[in-house]
């Protein structure tokens, strides 16, 4: 169907999250302080909704990033994520290039989905959001598409749905393959988180959750139209 008007109200992405366009994000860093510690890797995946109302991963971007000038580098963090910031094969770009590329991809997806604003989806989302927002502020990139503080945290959602808050455990509960050797790669973790978020949203739909809510909204819209006639 090319005409979105032919697709049921609740099967359109713009109506699923109150006009928000969800974007899966994962970052790898040189510490925990978004203002002082270096952002070293960033990956993002947008989502799309099919005509039956199911979410799927869509576009992706991935950047290795050079530490900003004066950034703090915590050796323990590098040991944890295995990043060698001096390896020329990283192909690292500046924060400016990474944030610009991210925002461009997100704004295109947001426009195509007819959404009003984008929202970060991440595992322990406050951490990832803080680094994205700090980098956006440092670089001065305009037209930030993301809500300044709203977010969807898959750790909280997985805790509610599966009783699991660790990404690998939540993926296992959802029967999503997870290779521990690839963990702490921003792109791999983003891909797993995207699959996890889609699974949880789609599973709720299959259980009769969101369609029930949307049906009430559709009924209200129909009633309003009939009243206006």
Swiss-Prot record:
The record marks 32, 80, 127, 149 as: Important for substrate binding and specificity. Homodimer. Keywords: Exonuclease, Hydrolase, Magnesium, Metal-binding, Nuclease, tRNA processing. PANTHER family: DNA POLYMERASE III SUBUNIT EPSILON, RIBONUCLEASE T. Pfam families: RNase_T (PF00929). InterPro entries: Exonuclease_RNaseT/DNA_pol3, RNase_T, RNaseH-like_sf, RNaseH_sf. NCBIfam families: RNaseT (TIGR01298). The active site is at 184 (proton donor/acceptor). The keyword Ubl conjugation does not apply. Mg(2+) 1 binds at residue 26. GO terms for biological process: DNA replication proofreading; tRNA processing. Binds two Mg(2+) per subunit. The active form of the enzyme binds two Mg(2+) ions in its active site. The first Mg(2+) forms only one salt bridge with the protein. It comes from Haemophilus influenzae (strain ATCC 51907 / DSM 11121 / KW20 / Rd). This is Ribonuclease T.
């Amino acid at each position: 169907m090319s005409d979105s008007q032919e697709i049921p109200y609740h099967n359109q992405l713009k109506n699923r999250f109150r006009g928000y366009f969800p974007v899966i994000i994962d970052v790898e860093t040189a510490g925990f302080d978004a203002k002082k510690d270096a952002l070293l890797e960033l990956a993002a995946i947008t989502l799309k909704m099919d005509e039956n109302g199911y979410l799927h991963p869509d576009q992706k971007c991935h950047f290795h990033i050079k530490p900003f000038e004066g950034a703090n580098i915590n050796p323990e963090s590098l040991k944890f994520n295995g990043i060698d910031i001096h390896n020329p094969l990283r192909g690292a770009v500046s924060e400016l290039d990474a944030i610009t590329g991210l925002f461009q991809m997100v704004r295109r997806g947001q426009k195509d989905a007819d959404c009003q604003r984008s929202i970060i989806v991440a595992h322990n989302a406050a951490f990832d959001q803080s680094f994205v927002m700090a980098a956006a502020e440092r670089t001065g990139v305009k037209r930030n598409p993301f809500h300044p503080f709203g977010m969807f945290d898959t750790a909280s959602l997985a805790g509610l749905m599966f009783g699991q808050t660790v990404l690998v455990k939540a993926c296992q509960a959802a029967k999503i393959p997870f290779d521990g050797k690839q963990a702490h790669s921003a792109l791999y973790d983003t891909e797993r988180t995207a699959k996890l978020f889609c699974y949880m949203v789609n599973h709720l739909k299959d259980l009769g959750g969101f369609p029930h809510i949307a049906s009430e909204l559709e009924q209200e819209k129909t009633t309003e139209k009939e009243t206006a006639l």
